[in-house]
Amino acid sequence: RLREIQDASKHPLRFRVSMEHFDEDKNDTIRGKGAYRKAIAGITCLAEVGFSPILTVTRTWKEECDSEMESQFVEVLRKSGVKQPQIKILPGFLLGQLAENERNYSQDEYVTEKCFEDFDITQLQCATSRMATGEGVYVCPILVDNPAARMGNSLGDTLRPFPLSHSACYTCRVTGMTCKSIP
């Protein structure tokens, strides 16, 4: 069915699958038991119908190891049948398990208007995209567990600006990170 939808659309259909590690045990320590196998099954299913999902991972290693880690993740995608492996490495957002393992955001880690004075706001995914889930449509994939980031039930409900008030917005700004899949 996904292939039919893609073939009928003038816009590309892209999928991103989130994992934390190429090792099953290390991934499941963060994502929960069985998460690795579910992700691999989803990646394999998408590859079988001709899609090349983008693998999104959160950096839990030193930045200088990015190249080595990316190679390992590319190998996981290739073994799953993905013809054009793409990896998106995100900085650590102090949310969920990472906040439990390390720390929460401090009172000083938030965005202000000054943060965006000489910054192209369209570089942030929230300026041009939304995250649709079974629970509604959210401003950002990082904030799908935050009820305040839920914008409505349909894409039509989200055709409006959203205040950049969450500390995760701070991480995007100070790291120069963008969730966009295409450079």
Regions of interest found by a model, annotated:
Residues R1-R3, D66-M69:
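Short secondary-structure transition/capping segments
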Residues R59-D66, K83-D108:
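Flexible glycine/acidic-rich beta-alpha junction loops that bind and position SAM and/or redox cofactors
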Residues A35-R37, S67-E75:
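Well-ordered, non-membrane alpha-helical segments in soluble/globular domains
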Residues L95-P183:
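Accessory C-terminal segments flanking Radical SAM cores
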Residues R1-R59:
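Radical SAM/AdoMet-radical enzyme domain recognition
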Residues R3-V17, Q72-L90:
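Structural recognition of alpha->loop->beta junctions
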Residues D28-T29, D66-E68, I142:
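A short secondary-structure junction signal
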